[in-house]
C-alpha cells in the first residue's frame, strides 16, 4: 500500500471507516492472516488484520484496561491468568500491573503477530514480555483450552471478530474448553463486537456460554477505533455475585492494587454492566 493514501476497513459491507496512511511500517501475509501496521496522524500506529482494525496507539488503553481490570478486580484474588490472543502485548501489559497475579499464560496462534508487534508497537507491550511471570504459547486457543492441564482464575479472550482465525474462538467447543480449565469461582471475558451493529454475535455468544456458566452477561466501553458505538464484552462465571459487587468494594480493591488508569475506575466498572434496553430485549428473546 502506498503512503498518503486511505486505508478502508472491510468489516461491514454497507458502511465503514477509513484511516489516512502516513507511513506503512509493515505489511505482510503471515501464515494465518494479512497483517498491516501503519502510522496515522490522529491515532498513531494502527494495526489491522484481514482488513479489520485491531488496535491503535491513541485509544488502546480503553479496551485493554476494561478487558483486564474488570475481571481481575471483580475476582479479587486471581493468581493465574490466561490470555487467548493478545499478540500485540497490551493485554499482557495490563495484567502484569496486578502484583498478586503469579502466572500469566498467553496463547497466540500467530507467532508473526507477536514478533512484528514487539518491533512496531513497543508501547503496547511496554516491556511486559520480559515479566518473569509470563509464558508465551504459540498454539490454537481452542486446542489449548481443551488439552492443557493448567487451570486459571481469569481467562481473557482477546479474539478478533468471528472471521478467519478468530472464528473458532466463538464456538461452543472453545467455551466448553474454557469452562474446563477455569477454577471454581473463575471469570471468563471476551470481546464481543459493537452490539448495535453486531447484535447477532452477542446473542449467539450468550446462548452458547449459558450452556456452561451459571451467570452470563455483558459489559461495555466506548472505544472510538471500533466503529459503530459501544464495544461489548462477554462475561461468564458461576458466581453471580461477582457481577453485582458494590462500587465501594471495587474501590477498596482498586486502592489496594495501586493501579493508575486512564479510563477504568470503580464507578466505570459498576456502570459498565448497565446494558441498553434493545440488547436486554434481544438477549431475553428465546432463540428460534
UniProtKB/Swiss-Prot annotation:
In which domain of life is the source organism classified? Bacteria
Residue numbers binding S-methyl-5'-thioadenosine? 33, 108, 140-141, 165
Write out the pathway annotation from the protein's UniProt entry: Amine and polyamine biosynthesis; spermidine biosynthesis; spermidine from putrescine: step 1/1
Report the CDD domains cross-referenced here: AdoMet_MTases (cd02440)
UniProt cross-references to InterPro entries, sorted A to Z: PABS (IPR030374), PABS_CS (IPR030373), SAM-dependent_MTases_sf (IPR029063), Spermi_synthase (IPR001045), Spermidine_synt_N (IPR035246), Spermidine_synt_N_sf (IPR037163)
Please provide an example of a Pfam family that matches this protein in its UniProt record: Spermine_synt_N
**Key word DNA-binding present in the record?**
no
The alphabetized UniProt keywords are: Cytoplasm, Polyamine biosynthesis, Spermidine biosynthesis, Transferase
Keyword ATP-binding found: no
Binding, spermidine: 64, 88, 158-161
- Catalysed reaction per UniProt? S-adenosyl 3-(methylsulfanyl)propylamine + putrescine = S-methyl-5'-thioadenosine + spermidine + H(+)
Q: What is its main location?
A: cytoplasm
Q: Which residues form the signal peptide?
A: none
Name all PABS domain ranges.
5-238
GO terms for biological process, alphabetical? spermidine biosynthetic process
Matching PROSITE patterns, A to Z?
Answer: PABS_1, PABS_2
The molecular function terms in GO held by this entry are: spermidine synthase activity
Q: Where in the cell is it found?
A: Cytoplasm
Q: Where is the active site?
A: 158
Tell me, in a sentence or two, what this protein's role is.
Catalyzes the irreversible transfer of a propylamine group from the amino donor S-adenosylmethioninamine (decarboxy-AdoMet) to putrescine (1,4-diaminobutane) to yield spermidine.
Quaternary state and interactors: Homodimer or homotetramer.
Task: Family membership, please give it.
Answer: Belongs to the spermidine/spermine synthase family.
Q: HAMAP family this protein is in?
A: Spermidine_synth
Q: What is this protein called?
A: Polyamine aminopropyltransferase
Amino acid at each position: 500500500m502506498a503512503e498518503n493514501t486511505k486505508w478502508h476497513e472491510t468489516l461491514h459491507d454497507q458502511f465503514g471507516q477509513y484511516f489516512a496512511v502516513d507511513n506503512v511500517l509493515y505489511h505482510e501475509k503471515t501464515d494465518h492472516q494479512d497483517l498491516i501496521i501503519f502510522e496515522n496522524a490522529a491515532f498513531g500506529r494502527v494495526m489491522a488484520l484481514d482488513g479489520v482494525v485491531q488496535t491503535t496507539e491513541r485509544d488502546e488503553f480503553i479496551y485493554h484496561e476494561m478487558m483486564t481490570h474488570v475481571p481481575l478486580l471483580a475476582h479479587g484474588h486471581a493468581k493465574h491468568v490466561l490470555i487467548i490472543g493478545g499478540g500485540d502485548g497490551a493485554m499482557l501489559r495490563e495484567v502484569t500491573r496486578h502484583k498478586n497475579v503469579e502466572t500469566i499464560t498467553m496463547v497466540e496462534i500467530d507467532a508473526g503477530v507477536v514478533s512484528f508487534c514487539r518491533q512496531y508497537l513497543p508501547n503496547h507491550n511496554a516491556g511486559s514480555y520480559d515479566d518473569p511471570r509470563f509464558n508465551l504459547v504459540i498454539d490454537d486457543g481452542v486446542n489449548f483450552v481443551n488439552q492443557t492441564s493448567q487451570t486459571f482464575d481469569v481467562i481473557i479472550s482477546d479474539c478478533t471478530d468471528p472471521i478467519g482465525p478468530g472464528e473458532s474462538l466463538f464456538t461452543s467447543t472453545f467455551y466448553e474448553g474454557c469452562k474446563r480449565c477455569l477454577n471454581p469461582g473463575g471469570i471468563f471475558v471476551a470481546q464481543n463486537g459493537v452490539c448495535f451493529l453486531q447484535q447477532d454475535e452477542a446473542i449467539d455468544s450468550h446462548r452458547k456460554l449459558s450452556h456452561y456458566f451459571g451467570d452470563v452477561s455483558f459489559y461495555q466501553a466506548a472505544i472510538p477505533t471500533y466503529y459503530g458505538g459501544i464495544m461489548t464484552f462477554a462475561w461468564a462465571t458461576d458466581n453471580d455475585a461477582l457481577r453485582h459487587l458494590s462500587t465501594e468494594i471495587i474501590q477498596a480493591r482498586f486502592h489496594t492494587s495501586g493501579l493508575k488508569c486512564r479510563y477504568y475506575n470503580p464507578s466505570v466498572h459498576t456502570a459498565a454492566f448497565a446494558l441498553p434496553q434493545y440488547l436486554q430485549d434481544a438477549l431475553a428473546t428465546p432463540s428460534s
